[in-house]
Amino acid sequence: MTDTTTTTTTDANKLVLEKSANSSGLEVDLHPLVLINISDHFTRTKVQSNYQDNCRVIGVILGVQNGRNVEICNSFEMVYATVDKQLVLDIEYLRKKYEQLFPLYDLLGWYSTGSQVSKDDILLHKQISEHNESPLYLMLDTDSPKSKDLPVIIYESELHIVNDEPTTIFVKTPYKIQTGEAERIGVNHIAKVTPSGSEGSGLTSHLFTMHNAISMLNIRVKALSDYLQAVKEKRLPYEQNILRKASSLCNQLPTIDTHDFKKSYLQEYNDVLLVTYLASITKTSASLNDTIDKYLVSNEKQSKRRFYQ
């Protein structure tokens, strides 16, 4: 993460400088936990804003830096306000949360969602620069769910001379995904739930299909029940064919009112009650043991006071 002052003929409106290789030699490792946190942050904000199209989230990225090696391990959300049509970060909130929750991590930079860098990003980047001389900027594009490539771009800033004025320019930095054991398990679970290349969740699709099937079954059963009630009250004619089919349908239901079923059910029910009872006894014993320990410690302190007196 470096700020390099160079003279360039870059257009003043261009905020990103495309490069084929990383000129600074920075090696960035990105953990999936960061992407999961950002995705969760964006999803919650999107739902709370009633799915507005201009939804955007901002936060900071944390990790460890050792020379030119940077490992982005975690992230958290940022509180900000709009002052004179500009975003202003709550630096006091950043300082308190950073010191209390993540004392072992370095503040490496910040993140946001979007597809293009704007001038507001330059201003936010300068605010983060008060805590890190050359922070990284991670952008997650939430508008490209069908993209096969990971929609994540990491920028570092360089200071260029544009039209004889120093200008901050973002430069794309290559990165690689680094996963821990816990992250690997979580990512594998998500991959099983959401098939690759699909916008929806496999679990959601399954539940939606099941909901439709149960709703349809409920409608049909209610219609049959209403018909039988109407026949019973002699509001509809007595149709042998329909009643025969209804009786056949009821006979297809499994009959579980047997001695073996009741015995198995009662045995399992008693096992559950026994486990619950043992858990309650264990919890009570632990509480009693803790109370006894506190009493012994208190009694020992009082004995020492009387001895020294």
Curated annotation (Swiss-Prot):
InterPro entries: EIF3F/CSN6-like_C (IPR024969), JAMM/MPN+_dom (IPR000555), MPN (IPR037518), MPN_CSN6 (IPR033859)
Single GO cellular component term: COP9 signalosome
Annotated PROSITE patterns: MPN (PS50249)
A molecular function GO annotation: metallopeptidase activity
Keyword annotations from UniProtKB, A to Z: Cytoplasm, Cytoplasmic vesicle, Nucleus, Signalosome
Gene Ontology process terms (BP): protein deneddylation
Main location: cytoplasm
Subcellular location: Cytoplasm; Nucleus; Cytoplasmic vesicle, Phagosome
Matches recorded under Gene3D superfamilies: Cytidine Deaminase, domain 2 (3.40.140.10)
Residue ranges constituting the MPN domain according to the UniProt record: 28-161
Further comment: Although strongly related to metalloprotease proteins, it lacks the JAMM motif that probably constitutes the catalytic center. Its function as protease is therefore unsure.
Family: Belongs to the peptidase M67A family. CSN6 subfamily.
Assembly and binders: Component of the CSN complex. The holocomplex is comprised of 8 subunits csn1-8. In the complex, it probably interacts directly with csn2, csn5 and csn7.
Functional summary from the UniProt entry: Component of the COP9 signalosome complex (CSN), a complex involved in various cellular and developmental processes. The CSN complex is an essential regulator of the ubiquitin (Ubl) conjugation pathway by mediating the deneddylation of the cullin subunits of E3 ligase complexes, leading to modify the Ubl ligase activity.
The name this protein goes by in its record: COP9 signalosome complex subunit 6
